[in-house]
Regions:
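Bacterial N-terminal signal peptides
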Residues: 7-17
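Short beta-strand elements in bilobed, periplasmic/extracellular small-molecule ligand-binding domains
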Residues: 58-75, 125-128
Length: 144
């Protein structure tokens, strides 16, 4: 999981040079981390936070700031509040949701890019990139 997050953050840093999506005032790219820090999937949320912090340390960039918010577990109200807080804080890219149960909710936030770690393939969406490992992708890798 750390390798996926390192690759993602490195890709953003190198491709966009953090200037394209960075806040104009301070030149820093604010990336939201939407993870369940409470409820049934609390351990997953803590693991995602630690993995993201390790990835950020690995790429050693002072121009990327991770802003974590609790999405709760299966709580749409808490989920939407967390997204609004991240957007208000200046995040244009959000890592999350961690599960596929909120894929329909993120369609409302068309100007925000979501990077989901879910292993379920969502229907095509303009603002969702799914980097989870699915059964289909593993079977294709075995075939090749």
């Amino acid at each position: 999981m750390i390798k996926i997050i390192i690759t993602f953050l490195s890709y953003i840093f190198l491709l966009f040079n953090t200037g394209l999506l960075a806040n104009e005032n301070d030149g820093k790219l604010k990336v939201g981390l939407l993870a369940p820090f409470s409820g049934e999937y609390k351990n997953l949320g803590e693991s995602l936070l630690l993995s993201t912090q390790l990835a950020l340390d690995e790429i050693n960039s002072e121009n990327i700031i991770i802003i974590p918010r609790d999405s709760g577990s299966n709580d749409k109200e808490k989920f939407n509040l967390a997204i609004k807080e991240l957007i208000d804080a200046g995040s244009k890219i959000i890592i999350g949701p961690a599960t596929s149960s909120h894929f329909n909710e993120i369609k409302k936030y068309k100007n925000t890019i979501f990077i989901s770690l879910s292993n379920k393939e969502p229907k095509i969406s303009n603002n969702l990139i799914n980097i989870g490992i699915s059964l289909e992708s593993q079977l294709e890798a075995i075939e090749n």
